[in-house]
Regions:
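Acidic low-complexity intrinsically disordered segments
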Residues: 165-181, 185, 273-407
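Phosphate-binding glycine-rich/basic clefts of nucleotide- and phosphate-handling proteins
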Residues: 52-170, 279-340
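Conserved phosphate-binding/catalytic loops in two-lobed NTP-binding clefts
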Residues: 1-12, 229-267
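Phosphate/ATP-binding catalytic cores across multiple sugar-kinase/actin-like superfamilies
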Residues: 17-30, 163-209, 224-227, 273
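Short glycine-rich phosphate-binding loop at a beta-alpha junction
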Residues: 103-111, 206-217
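Gly/Thr-rich phosphate-binding beta-strand-loop-beta motif of the actin/hexokinase/Hsp70
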Residues: 25-68, 214, 270
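Nucleotide/phosphate-binding catalytic cleft detector across ATP-hydrolyzing
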Residues: 1-38
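Phosphate/oxyanion-binding active-site loops and adjacent basic polyanion-contact surfaces
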Residues: 10-17, 42-45, 79-87, 172-194, ...
Length: 407
């Protein structure tokens, strides 16, 4: 039996969900019509975006439909469980005097900036991780899942101190309005990035209408529909947005025992788009980068007046040098981010990560203007090259060359 067992690369999850939703909702393309779609997959760990075109297959003997998807992106930090971690961090940060007195430590999420005075409180020990999990799971999940019926001003929680002993009945103040504002801000930023990425994905298309499918259990939050409806109103003169939330998808098969959900929708989509099926799924990004399975993962740039100035993006071609700037010493700094907002050149540079690259020699010579170029080599790797004149990058007359890893 195992000799017949095969594992094959199929559609990604958002594309598979789109296949299922388009088929189940009976969104039928007319002859030569392109139907544009987007998927906002807001899960527990991350949020994924996917965009594409649904159309009738040109080869009717082989397929009924073709789905071409492209412009995939997302937010690796926007997810229900990550929001819980950030809520816990916010509550801990608002109660530092009590925590310091009891020697209680907690975890700061990697995407949150360091706050002054928390040096001895933030740790990554087993106890610190347990404290963050306990506060989030036991006391803050109801706020995130909108289950609380009465206002919460404080919680009593048992936490571990730095010595590993359990401290009982710790009274932590909670500002529920601030926690809800944090949730809304996180979701709003994620949806803003979705639309930035959508405009970029469809920039070469004449788009009048887009079907948007909300997937992932975190899309149940009321702020998600509220913010998407705001975009529907704001963009009505530009294009029509049709939003399908989880409830709309579930209603498709309400009489069927095997109802469509965020998870089963992906499974059905993978079945519909399997090899030998009647739906052909193609990934434009993979076709354009035949030697590389995925696009470059980051937005890379420099700091211009405290704004992120984008030089390389996930749309950039591999092995194509881009001018980065003038090098002035034996070190240069680059900024990088996974947020689609980075491509607008309006994002604060402080919201990106910074990478300092040590060079092989010092270029502190005001009479010579050495130019530095960057190119993407792999999904998370760059090469830099330093030249004296612009023409030298074409002739490969390099003064210095090196690799940069963004892992």
């Amino acid at each position: 039996l195992m000799k017949k067992f095969r594992v094959k690369h199929g559609s990604n999850e958002p594309a598979a969900y789109a296949v299922c939703a388009l088929k189940k909702l009976k969104i039928e393309p007319k002859e030569n019509e392109k139907i544009y779609y987007g998927v906002f997959d807001f899960g527990g760990g991350t949020t994924d975006f996917d965009f594409g075109i649904w159309k009738n297959s040109e080869d009717e003997d082989m397929f009924d439909y073709e789905l071409e998807h492209f412009g995939a992106g997302g937010d690796i930090h926007l997810g229900g469980e990550n929001i819980l971690k950030e809520l816990a961090y916010k509550v801990f940060s608002d109660n530092t005097p009590e925590l310091r007195k009891r020697k209680i430590q907690y975890v700061r999420p990697e995407w949150c900036p360091e706050l002054s005075g928390e040096e001895i409180l933030v740790e990554y020990t087993r106890e610190a991780k347990l404290n963050t999990r306990k506060l989030g799971e036991e006391k803050l999940r109801d706020i995130w899942e909108e289950k609380e019926t009465e206002r919460i001003d404080n919680v009593l929680v048992n936490l571990f101190n730095a010595d590993g002993s359990l401290e009982t009945g710790i009274d932590l103040k909670i500002n529920e309005e601030e926690l809800k504002a944090l949730i809304k801000d996180k979701i709003e930023k994620g949806i803003k990035n979705f639309f930035i990425k959508m405009e970029d994905a469809f920039k070469d298309e004449d788009v009048k209408k887009v079907h948007i499918f909300l997937a992932g259990n975190s899309c149940r939050h009321s702020f998600v529909n509220e913010i998407f409806e705001k975009y529907v109103a704001e963009m009505k003169d530009k294009m029509e947005l049709v939003i399908y939330d989880l409830k709309a998808i579930k209603e498709i098969d309400k009489e069927n025992d095997s109802k469509i959900t965020g998870k089963t929708g992906v499974a059905y989509g993978l079945i519909y788009s399997r090899k030998g099926g009647r739906i052909k799924v193609t990934n434009r990004d993979e076709k354009e980068n035949m030697a590389n399975e995925v696009n470059f993962k980051f937005y890379v740039g420099n700091n211009r007046r405290n704004k992120f100035n984008c030089v390389i993006s996930p749309n950039s071609n591999y092995n194509e040098y881009k001018f980065f700037g003038i090098v002035k010493s034996d070190i240069f700094e680059l900024y990088y981010s996974t947020s689609p907002e980075a491509q607008t050149n309006e994002m604060k540079s402080s919201e990106a990560k910074i990478k300092r690259v040590n060079l092989k020699k010092d270029y502190d010579d005001e009479e010579e203007r050495y130019r530095i170029y960057l190119k993407a080599d792999k999904s998370d790797k760059l090469t830099y090259a330093i030249v004296k004149e612009e023409k030298d990058i074409e002739t490969k007359k390099l003064v210095e060359e090196g690799e940069i890893s963004l892992n």
